[in-house]
A protein has these predicted regions:
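N-terminal helix-loop segment corresponding to the beta1-alpha1 unit
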Residues: 1-196, 371, 375-385
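Flexible, small-/acidic-enriched active-site or ligand-binding loops
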Residues: 2-3, 281, 345-385
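Glycine-rich beta-alpha junction loops
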Residues: 47, 134-135, 207-212, 249-251, ...
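Conserved Rossmann-fold dehydrogenase catalytic segment
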Residues: 136, 164-172, 195-211, 230-237, ...
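Oxidoreductase and adenylate-handling cofactor-binding alpha/beta cores
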Residues: 180-200, 213, 217-225, 266-273
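Aromatic-enriched alpha-helical interface/lid elements that frame and gate functional surfaces
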Residues: 240-316, 320
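A glycine-rich dinucleotide-binding beta-alpha-beta segment and adjacent secondary-structure elements
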Residues: 315-366
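Single conserved hydrophobic/aromatic residue that forms the stacking wall/gate
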Residues: 382, 386-398
Length: 398
């Protein structure tokens, strides 16, 4: 059954998250928590999160990037340079927050008195998550960073692309989004512990640490042999045949990663003699002779259409897939059957939902992305009711 905003699972309902976040990593973490029911209050500088301007394309007043990451959040504007407003923000955190997320530039929250140790000293139950660039310690801890820099520094780019050609960034922001995901893992760990102890924690994650985690299997090869893995194109180090091929009308990926699957592949491509060929008799042999094996498979695959290959390979039980565009993925019946792309209430927007379901229901957005400072006044008034010595946060110009 498809979930609607009223029936969508909201296991984090009642959890209040203050997001001092910009760009991708912290907003993606806030997005996950928001889609699962948390109230996420996004604190923005006076001209807003820079991601609002990351376009084109723009959709209903902000970039598609921003809208995808910030739906169902409140937006509050704060002039961090004004000490009165920083104090008001601190009070908002102490009064309402269960969780604080922050990925501001290194040292900024400490100057504002909004760092984890300062806030936990006043509110021990708070869970505070730092999303940094290089990590909480070490010679580079104070440097800023972004996804492509960390794909480069963390070794991801060095193993991505075709052999003999320049390194390539993975198209998706895997380091930014992975860091957001790891921050949620850390936050949930701390919240689970808080149920038992009543105390929060400071959680530290970073883009660099996330990048190293994505390369952990490749790093295992280096740690075992002392040799850095090389680029494999669409293939995988240590497994053959296991890559994409150009067909008559597109591309197809074939993953014949075991001896039995290779025997089946040899039959499908019309070369049963490969089964007993000493060069290809087992995976280590195929890896040693993969240049010749791939040359022959490349020639064969180019002779037929993608759909013909997929039909024959699937009939033989060989894992394979056409290389789909984003448009093909979005419109595929499997995507639609899973309800992976959902409309956003009160907008014409559609976005990819969280890749999980609870009791068969996928969490869906409860509200649209906020305009800049849209909720400053309403949250300001709520804080005023809580504290008679309230100093207001910024007002948006009319």
């Amino acid at each position: 059954m498809r979930a609607t905003p009223s029936s969508s699972p909201q296991p984090f309902k009642g959890l209040v998250v203050i997001e001092l976040g910009h760009s991708v990593a912290a907003p993606f973490a806030g997005h996950i928590l928001s889609e699962l029911g948390a109230e996420v209050i996004k604190i923005e500088k006076s001209d807003g999160d820079d991601a609002r301007r990351w376009g084109p394309p723009f959709w209903e007043g902000a970039s598609a990037f921003f809208q995808a990451l910030n739906r169902n959040k409140s937006s509050v504007v704060c002039n961090f340079r004004d000490p009165h407003e920083s104090q008001a923000l601190q009070r908002l955190i102490l009064e309402r927050a269960d969780v604080v997320l922050q990925n501001l530039r290194p040292g900024h929250v400490e100057k504002l008195g909004l760092d984890g140790p300062t806030l936990l000293a006043q509110k021990p139950s708070l869970v505070y998550c730092n999303l940094g660039a290089f990590g909480r310690t070490g010679p580079l801890k104070d440097r800023p960073g972004y996804d492509p820099l960390m794909q480069a520094f963390g070794g991801v780019m060095s193993t991505t692309g075709e052999p003999g050609r320049p390194s390539v960034r993975v198209g998706a922001s895997i380091v930014d989004m992975g860091t957001g995901l790891w921050s949620v893992v850390g936050i949930l760990t701390a919240l689970y512990e808080r149920v038992q102890t009543g105390r929060g924690r400071v959680v530290d994650v970073s883009l660099f640490e996330t990048a190293t985690s994505w390369t952990s299997l490749l790093a295992a090869q280096y740690l075992c042999t002392g040799e850095s893995p090389q680029k494999q194109g669409s293939g995988a180090s240590g497994i053959a045949p296991y890559k994409a091929y150009i067909t008559l009308d597109g591309e197809v990926v074939v993953a014949a990663g075991s001896d039995s699957l290779f025997r089946s592949l040899a039959q499908v491509v019309g070369h049963p003699e490969w089964i007993d060929d000493p060069r290809f008799v087992d995976n280590p042999s195929r890896v040693r002779n993969q240049v010749e094996l791939y040359r022959m498979l490349d020639d064969l695959m180019a002779q037929r259409a993608t759909r013909d290959w997929v039909n024959d390979l699937e009939a033989a039980g060989i894992p394979c897939s056409p290389v789909q565009s984003i448009a093909q993925m979005a419109e595929h019946p499997q995507t639609q059957a899973l309800g992976l792309i959902q409309p956003v209430p009160d907008t014409g927007m559609r976005f990819v939902s969280l890749p999980l379901s609870l009791d068969g229901q996928r969490p869906v957005s409860q509200g649209r992305p906020p305009t800049l400072g849209e909720h400053t006044d309403s949250i300001d008034r709520k804080s005023t009711r809580l504290n008679s010595s309230h100093i207001p946060l910024s007002r948006m110009p009319s």
